[in-house]
């Protein structure tokens, strides 16, 4: 095979070729490392030998040789003693094995003992070799330590002696460490040997108990009783199974003790050991494999219905014809004329052959069975002869399902318990059972006998899938059922796919809506941020705006009243054109301003004339009133004000700026007394210039606003004829407009100081007063001036 480059490779034939190469390389590296370690060990041994030779040349070499000889003798004595102990142990083990061979006739135990003996011998040899090696290392360590001491004691300052002493000390330390490690290994091996002995003792104890049970069973065997032979055969099978299980367990345990590079290793603490549960499962599996299938009654998974609880039940089987049915219970193939099968309810499984006379007597003594037989004869679709018995004593049925996990299995049990029992086979010569006939027989015989089940495995009456094969189904019906199942599978798959697609669509739609919601939230945040920025820019630009300062001199007229827009705009937090603080939206005139003090701009009041005059009116000139030609109908609604003496050139408002171009004189209050019946003008400190009017807007004022909006007038339209007092005194100016009284301020000195004295409506400086027109006429100038007493303005 060739790859994309056109080169042949072995990937298809050797999938683990690269891994094998890596493993080989690793093995080669490990082998090289082992060789290097061996070379280093050889070099160390050579150095030690050289050191020993140099030490022998010392002056105390004779004493050293004597000590070495004594140690060698002690070592030889220890070896001889160990050999004698080994021989004694081997003899004892052989005697013990002979005794066990005499007691244990099986081969498995002998093999176990042999394996145990070999394991013990190996462990003993290893322990002896380890002890001998440890003794040798200890001796060499002692020699090296002695040599080191001798070298250090008799050193004459030579550099060679110092080097020899240091090397000898290092070698002694290494040997002591190896000796300690050997001792630890020996202790671990002894512990593992004890664990193995305990396990083997447990296995041997079980074997001895099993052998004793076998001997007792052999003594109790009786060749005459068939039942005893069957039970003994079962016990022997169990014993053999247990022996095989023990043998396998011991073999598995011995396989754990695997030799690796010639070193016998015992099982570590982390290796899995055999537990009683594993032994039990092994015994069960071997028992299932070794035991033969026995033909036990009621093997099909159901039990015959208990017709009578205490008396015997007999069923007569008169087989006069040889049908092709496969449910025959007799073992012979010829036609039987009178076979009687008697089943005892007390002892199930005992079969006896009785004579026809005994069967007839039992039938006569059991009236219930006679009734049942009568019912059996009256079953429709039954032949003249009775059919075979459906209780299969020898073996299970061949053409019926024996599963109890579905509804069809329960039907089969009722069919076998009912139809065959009462002789309703309905055979038509072809061996096919009639299921409907059997159900009819069961219904006529009794409802209590068709719903029986086994106590061990009760039949479930719930739903469930029917078995794949049924005896009473033709090939056409099976084909139809298969086609129907395939069609149902395809429909279920389509339904699942449709559900999945719908779920995916809904999830996508939800994701889209969530994304849209997030986008809208972001857009709202952006718009709010821009609004805040624009508001901040407007607030920052308002103090320096030249247009706002030019509007301070403009005047708006509403229903005959004057409203300074400059003061309105500066006193209402900078909202010059539109302020949305709860104003009346029913105003039809789009040229009027909306005040933040919740006043109706169509009611004819002076708005915005508040404390802002303190900051704006002091440095500005008086209001400039210019005549503008407007409609005559609107001029009729303008109220003529009396002459204000405070607006002359001697007032305090004229001190800061140039004089106005034109002014108009207002008439006195006395001339308007006959028309001021409903006029209430507050002059006290509590009264405010912002006096709202109650009622609807005048109709004459709203007529001009509906067709088209007009521009806001900047000045008050005053005719020359209105400037004369004689014309004002005539009284042509209306005091009411559509039933709404007109309220105007009283005639007084309305300069800045008088307004600051408490007439601005900010905070009352005295008790509440209700002024009248008479009080206004008698005391027109009761407002305090800065010359008489200080100001009484109270700030919040």
From Swiss-Prot:
GO cellular component, one term: nucleus
Keywords: Activator, DNA-binding, Nucleus, Phosphoprotein, Transcription, Transcription regulation
Organism phylogeny: Eukaryota, Metazoa, Ecdysozoa, Arthropoda, Hexapoda
Top-level taxon: Eukaryota
Keyword RNA-binding: no
Gene behind the chain: kay
Job of this protein: Developmentally regulated transcription factor AP-1 binds and recognizes the enhancer DNA sequence: 5'-TGA[CG]TCA-3'. May play a role in the function or determination of a particular subset of cells in the developing embryo. It is able to carry out its function either independently of or in conjunction with Jra.
Protein name per UniProt: Transcription factor kayak
Gene Ontology annotations of biological process type: embryo development ending in birth or egg hatching
Chain intervals with Low complexity compositional bias: 402-429
Span list, region Basic motif: 480-499
TM ranges: none
Entry's family note: Belongs to the bZIP family. Fos subfamily.
């Amino acid at each position: 095979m060739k790859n994309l480059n056109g080169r042949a490779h072995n990937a298809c034939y050797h999938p683990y070729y690269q891994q094998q190469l890596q493993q080989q390389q690793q093995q080669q590296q490990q082998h090289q490392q082992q060789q290097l370690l061996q070379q280093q060990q050889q070099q160390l041994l050579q150095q030690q030998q050289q050191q020993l030779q140099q030490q022998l040349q010392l002056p105390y070499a004779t004493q050293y040789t004597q000590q070495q000889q004594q140690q060698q003798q002690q070592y030889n004595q220890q070896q001889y003693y160990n050999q004698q102990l080994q021989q004694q142990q081997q003899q004892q083990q052989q005697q013990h094995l002979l005794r066990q061979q005499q007691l244990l006739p099986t081969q498995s135990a002998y093999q176990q003992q042999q394996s145990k003996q070999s394991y013990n011998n190996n462990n003993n040899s290893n322990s002896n070799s380890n002890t001998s090696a440890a003794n040798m290392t200890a001796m060499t360590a002692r020699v090296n330590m002695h040599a080191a001491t001798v070298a250090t004691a008799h050193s004459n300052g030579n550099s060679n002696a110092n080097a020899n002493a240091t090397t000898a000390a290092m070698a002694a330390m290494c040997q002591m460490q190896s000796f300690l490690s050997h001792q630890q290994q020996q202790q671990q091996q002894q512990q593992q040997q004890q664990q193995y002995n305990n396990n083997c003792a447990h296995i041997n104890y079980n074997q001895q108990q099993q052998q004793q049970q076998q001997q007792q069973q052999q003594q109790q065997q009786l060749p005459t009783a068939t039942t005893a032979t069957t039970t003994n055969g079962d016990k022997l099978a169990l014993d053999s199974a247990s022996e095989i299980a023990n043998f396998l367990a011991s073999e598995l345990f011995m396989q754990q003790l695997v030799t690796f590079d010639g070193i016998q290793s015992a099982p570590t603490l982390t290796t899995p050991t055999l537990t009683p549960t594993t032994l039990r499962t092994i015994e069960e599996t071997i028992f299932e494999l070794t035991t033969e299938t026995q033909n036990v009654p009621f093997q099909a998974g159901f039990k015959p219905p208990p017709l009578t609880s205490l008396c015997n039940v007999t069923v007569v089987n008169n087989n006069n014809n040889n049908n092709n049915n496969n449910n025959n219970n007799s073992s012979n193939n010829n036609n039987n004329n009178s076979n009687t099968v008697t089943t005892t309810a007390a002892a199930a499984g005992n079969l006896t052959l009785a004579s026809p006379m005994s069967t007839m007597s039992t039938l006569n003594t059991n009236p219930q069975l006679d009734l049942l037989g009568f019912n059996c004869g009256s079953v429709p679709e039954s032949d003249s002869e009775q059919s075979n018995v459906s209780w299969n004593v020898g073996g299970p049925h061949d053409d019926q399902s024996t599963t109890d996990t579905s509804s069809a299995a329960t039907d089969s049990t009722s069919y076998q318990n009912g139809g065959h029992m009462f002789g309703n086979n309905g055979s038509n010569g072809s061996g096919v059972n009639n299921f409907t006939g059997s159900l009819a027989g069961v219904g006529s015989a009794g409802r209590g006998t068709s719903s029986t089940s086994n106590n061990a495995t009760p039949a479930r009456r719930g739903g469930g899938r029917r078995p794949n094969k049924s005896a009473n189904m033709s090939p056409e019906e099976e084909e139809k059922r298969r086609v129907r199942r395939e069609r149902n599978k395809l429909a279920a798959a389509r339904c699942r796919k449709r559900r999945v697609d719908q779920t995916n669509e809904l999830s996508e739609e939800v994701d889209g809506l969530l994304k849209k919601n997030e986008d809208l939230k972001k857009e709202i945040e952006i718009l709010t941020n821009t609004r805040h920025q624009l508001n901040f820019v407007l607030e920052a630009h308002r103090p320096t705006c030249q247009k706002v300062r030019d509007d301070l001199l403009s005047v708006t007229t509403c229903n005959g009243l004057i409203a300074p827009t400059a003061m309105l705009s500066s006193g209402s937090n900078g909202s010059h054109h539109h302020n949305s603080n709860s104003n009346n939206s029913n105003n039809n005139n789009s040229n009027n301003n909306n005040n933040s003090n919740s006043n109706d701009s169509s009611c004819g009041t002076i708005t915005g004339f508040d404390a802002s005059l303190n900051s704006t009116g002091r440095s500005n000139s008086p209001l400039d009133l210019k005549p503008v030609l407007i409609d005559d109908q609107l001029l009729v609604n303008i109220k003529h004000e009396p002459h204000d003496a405070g607006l002359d050139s001697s007032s305090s408002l004229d001190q800061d700026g140039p004089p106005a171009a034109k002014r108009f004189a207002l008439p006195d209050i006395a001339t308007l007394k006959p028309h001021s019946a409903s006029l209430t003008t507050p002059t006290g400190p509590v009264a405010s210039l912002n006096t709202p009017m109650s009622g609807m807007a005048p109709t004459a004022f709203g007529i001009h606003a509906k067709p088209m909006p007009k521009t806001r007038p900047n000045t008050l339209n005053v005719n020359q004829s209105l400037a004369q007092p004689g014309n004002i005194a005539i009284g042509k100016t209306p005091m009411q407009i559509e039933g709404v009284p007109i309220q105007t301020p009283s005639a007084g000195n309305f300069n800045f100081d008088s307004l600051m004295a408490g007439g601005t409506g900010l905070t009352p400086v005295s008790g509440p007063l209700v002024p009248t027109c008479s009080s206004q006429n008698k005391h027109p100038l009761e407002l305090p001036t800065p010359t008489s007493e200080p100001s009484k303005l109270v700030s919040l």
